[in-house]
Regions:
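Membrane-interface interhelical connector segments
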Residues: 37-58, 62
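Extended, low-polarity transmembrane helix blocks
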Residues: 1-37, 60-68, 72-153
Length: 153
C-alpha cells in the first residue's frame, strides 16, 4: 500500500475512540437520510438539491457532496470504513453550516420554536467529535482495522 493508504487505514485498539465514531455516525445519519431519502420528514434528493441550489446558492456538485457526506459518511463512521475521510467530510459540512446558515441564529438551540432558526452549538459538538476520529482512525470493531490487519503494510 502507498503511504496515503497506510495513513487512511492505520488505526489503534483504544476502545474509547469507538464511542465518538459510532455516536457521531448515528446522530448524522438521520440528517443524511432526510436529505437523500426523504425519511424523518425530509425532502428527498430532488427537494434538498433544489433548496441548496436555488435558496442557498450552493453549486450543484457541492450540494451532492453534502448529501453524500451526511448519508454515506455517517454509514462509513458507523462501520468504521474510511473513518478519517468520513470524519473530515462531516467536519467540513458542519463548519460550512456554521459559517453559511447559522450565525444569525446565535449559539443556542431553539427549544421553544419561537426564534427563526437553530443555533450552532450542535455543529460545534459534531466538529469536536470529528477531531479524535481524524487522529485515531476507526479503532476497534472497524472496517479500517480489519483492512489494516488483513493487508499489512
Amino acid at each position: 500500500m502507498t503511504t496515503f493508504m497506510k495513513y487512511l487505514f492505520q488505526t489503534n485498539d483504544k476502545f474509547s475512540y469507538w464511542v465518538p465514531r459510532v455516536i457521531l455516525g448515528c446522530v448524522i445519519l438521520p440528517h443524511g437520510a432526510q436529505k437523500l431519502l426523504g425519511w424523518f420528514g425530509g425532502y428527498r434528493l430532488e427537494g434538498t438539491l433544489g433548496f441548496f441550489t436555488d435558496k442557498l446558492g450552493v453549486p450543484l456538485f457541492i450540494a451532492i457532496l453534502i448529501i453524500l457526506g451526511e448519508s454515506l459518511g455517517a454509514l462509513g463512521l458507523i462501520t468504521g470504513f474510511l473513518t478519517r475521510f468520513c470524519a473530515m467530510g462531516i467536519l467540513m459540512i458542519m463548519t460550512e453550516a456554521i459559517i453559511m446558515s447559522h450565525p444569525a441564529n446565535g449559539f443556542f438551540t431553539n427549544w421553544s420554536g419561537q426564534d427563526a432558526g437553530e443555533g450552532f452549538k450542535y455543529h460545534i459538538l459534531a466538529i469536536a467529535l470529528c477531531i479524535p476520529l481524524l487522529i485515531s482512525g476507526g479503532v476497534r470493531f472497524s472496517a479500517d482495522g480489519f483492512i489494516a490487519k488483513r493487508f499489512p503494510l
